[in-house]
Structure formats: structure tokens, C-alpha cells
Amino acid sequence: MVNNNNKNNKINDRENEENEKNKKKDKIYENKIGINENNNENNNYQNENFIYTSGDSNDTQEGDISEIQEESTNENNKKLKKRKIKKTKSLYFYKCVTGPDKLFFIVTQIFILVPSLFFEIKLVPISLEISKKLEISNYIITLTLLVFIFYNLYKCAFTNPGIITRNNIEESKKDKIKLTKLQATKKALKKFITSGMDEIANDDPISSSSDFSDSDDDDQDEQGGSSSARNSFENSGDFIVEMEQPTNSNNNNSNNNNNNNKNRNRNNNNNNNNNNNNKNQSKYKEIQIGDSDFKYKCKFCITCGLYREPRSFHCSTCNNCVENFDHHCVWIGNCIGRRNYREFFYFITTTLIYALYLLSMSIVFLNQIVNTTESPANKINNNNINSNSSNHNSSNDLNEKFEKSINNILYALRTTSGGLCIFIIIFGFIMSLLLGFLVSYHIRLTLSNKSTIEDFKKIFENQINPYDKGWLFNLKIKLFNFNNSNNNININNNNTNNNINS
């Protein structure tokens, strides 16, 4: 009886020691892994059941789990730094908003100002030789066009194109950190469980650690160890860990381990499939546009943390989602969207008119320079003709006039005014050609109520454009902001309807 009491006391002591060690392990999980930081997100992982066949808990040290956790959190933190949320690249000053690239914006102003200064200072005074009214009209027309050009240029460059406000970036960062911690706990538990199962497969820890020779006492010891293990690992709050007592035979241990591995792999595969389905479902939202059969897919923007509204796209240069995004214009240094497309269209059209005007007037001035100037070679020829007027023929007159005109043109090109005329003619021709293609392209887009990126991606290629309401109504919408409420909806609100009237 005394021996049995001593053995029972030893068994109880061992149970108490195991319970204390298991409590310490639970504290390690709570303090270092951060299991209880986000109870809402923890529910996503409560359905994962891990089956663990445990031996003697004395074989495991307290620092093993914490070391595994620290390694896994470091890996996840490195991934989080790579996916760090970038801030917007747009520049804000009171109500002025512009993009980050300002070098080409300065070049655009130089391309407009330099030819204009040469034209106003050097060439417009030549029109006085033709007519006084022509000189005054040149000053009025050129200055008026320059005012319209720079007004639309600066308004387009410093107007908010329709940037969609982001969700709170700090909250999204905290959510990502919490998710990485939960993923780290998952990896740590998997490593801890698989390492324990490998040890059990090699030998029987409980039978080797038993200090008693009687079979009855061994049975009592095994029952005590299994009950204490179940009590200590019972529903930790995030994961359900089931403890099973191994049998004495190694064959049964290996069979149980194989079955447990298969069950765990099946559960993991099912959970991965469910997570992938949830990601695919939450990546897009389909919305029907008006009464048409066209369904617009609103994509979720990871950077801005919101669902993009119809016809909205993310600009990689400014790092913003923009309403009715058309394109990012490098020459203006800003995105072209719902709020500044009208000014962009007016800018390119007025610049085209100005380039054509400079081209035509430079040709007129060059003709005037050629007619009013006479080369020294022509003066010598005229003196020779006057001295030999008796031998003068009509056939020679045509040749002499042609030679005179060529000599006068070559001589005029050597002068400052003639060289500037040639420069402005070449510059105006190139700018008129490029801007002519650009303006004609945007006229076609305006009449069909499409944007540049929609035409480039061919979104409405195989179906009718639901936003096309006729060329007259499209002109009112695009160029006069008449009833421009295509995107008057908050797609990120759960209470919004899936039917948008265009």
C-alpha cells in the first residue's frame, strides 16, 4: 500500500509539472506570437483542425516554439516590406494638384514661348511693309491665342483630375501586420507539430521515459499523461489541437501518423481552395451599366484599398485611382481625367490653331522678304543688262528671272528675318502635323464618348458602348460637362445597387 501511494504521488507530481510547462507554452504563444490581437481575423483559422500524436512533453523545450515563431515573423516582415504601400506621387498645394514629372512640362512651355517671341519681335514688324492693319491684327490674334493656350495649359496641369480618395493606409498596414502574425502562428504550429510527429515515429517517448516496471502502474501513467495533455492543449483560442495517445506498437504509430498526415493535408488543401475562391470572388465586382446588357467589372485596387468605379483606372505614374481616367500626359505633367479633360482638349486645339497661324504668316513674311531684298549678284546682272539692252531676247528674260528669284531666296535665307521664317515654318509644320493627328483622334473619341485607355484596351470592341448617347449629347458631356454623372456612385459601399444609369 505504501508503494502504491508513493507511485500515485509521483504520478500526480508529474501531471502538475506537465500542466505548469504547458501553461508556460501558452503564455509564450500569447505574448510573442500575438494570438489574441485580432479576434475577428482569428475566426478565419478556427476551422483548421490539427491532429497531433503526442508523447512525453518533457522532450520539448520551452524556447523551441518561440524560436520558430521569430524566424517565421522575420520572413513575413521582409515580404511585407517588399509589398509596402506606396504613397501618392502627386503634389498638393491648397487646391492645386499636379503630377511628379515636371521636366517635360517646362519643355512644353519653352516650345510655345520661344517661337512666339521670335515671331512677335522679329517677324510681325515686317507686316508693316504690307499694311498697318495687318500688323495690328497679328499682335491681337497671337496674344489672344497665347492667353487661351496658357490658361488651358495651367488649368489642366494644376487641376485635380478626379483622384479617388484612398482608404486609411495606416489601418490597412496594421491589418497586414496582424495577418502576418496569424500566418506566423500557423507556420509555427505546423513546424512544431510535424517535428513532434517525426520524433514519435522514431521511438515511443512515454514507454522509454517510464520509471516503473509494473504494467498496472504504466497504464495509470499513460492515462494520466494523456489526460493532462488534453487538458493543457484544449482549444487554445485560435487553433483546435487534438491530442491522441499512441499505442505501444511501432506499426500502429506509423499507421496513425500516416493517417493524420493525410487528414491534415486534406484539410489544408480544402482551406487553400476556399481561400483562393474567396480571393477570386472579392477581386472583382460586376455592375450592370444602365439598361444595357454590358456588365462592367470593377477591380479591387490593392494600393488604394478600394473598388475602382466604372471607367476609373489606376495611374502608375501618379500612383492614384482617377475617375474617368483618359491617360497620363507627360507634356502637361498630370493625369487627364473627368475634371480636366475639357481643358486638355481646348489646349491641344488652340495650340494647333496657333501653330497653323504661325506657319501661314511665316510663309507670307518670307515671300515679302524675298520680293523686297535683292542680292548683289542680281544688281551686277541688272547693270550688264542695261548696257546690252540691244541684244536682249524674250527667251533669255525667263532664265534671268528664274536666276534672280533663286539668288534672292538664297540671299534672303542668309538674313536674320529670313532664317527665322524658315525656322518657324519647319517648326510649325511639324507641330501642326503631330497636333493634327492628336486632335483628330480625340475628336473621334469625344464623338463616341470613349477614353484613350478604353480605346487602347478595346473594352467596347465586341459590344455596344453603353455610354454612347449620340455625337451631340457626347459633345455636351465631354466638352461642356453637361450632365456628366456617369460615376455618381460609391462602389465601395455595400448598400449600393448593382445597376448604374449612365
UniProtKB/Swiss-Prot annotation:
Residue ranges of the region described as Disordered: 1-80, 200-281
Active site: C329 (s-palmitoyl cysteine intermediate)
Gene Ontology CC annotations of this record: endoplasmic reticulum; Golgi apparatus; membrane
Keyword set includes Transmembrane helix: yes
E.C. no: 2.3.1.225
Catalytic reaction annotation: L-cysteinyl-[protein] + hexadecanoyl-CoA = S-hexadecanoyl-L-cysteinyl-[protein] + CoA
Subcellular localization: Membrane
Molecular function GO labels: protein-cysteine S-palmitoyltransferase activity
Bias-annotated ranges (Basic and acidic residues): 10-30
Classification via InterPro entries: Palmitoyltrfase_DHHC, PFA4/ZDH16/20/ERF2-like
Entry keyword set: Acyltransferase, Glycoprotein, Lipoprotein, Membrane, Palmitate, Transferase, Transmembrane, Transmembrane helix
Enzyme class label: transferase
A GO BP annotation: protein targeting to membrane
Topology of this chain in the membrane: Multi-pass membrane protein
Residue span, DHHC domain: 299-349
Keyword presence, Acyltransferase: yes
Biased composition (Low complexity): 31-52, 203-212, 248-280
Biased composition (Acidic residues): 59-73, 213-222
Main subcellular location of this protein, as a coarse class: membrane
Transmembrane parts of this sequence: 104-124, 134-154, 344-364, 419-439
PANTHER family (alphabetical): ZDHHC-TYPE PALMITOYLTRANSFERASE 3-RELATED, ZINC FINGER DHHC DOMAIN CONTAINING PROTEIN
Family designation: Belongs to the DHHC palmitoyltransferase family.
Domain free text: The DHHC domain is required for palmitoyltransferase activity.
Record-given protein name: Putative ZDHHC-type palmitoyltransferase 3
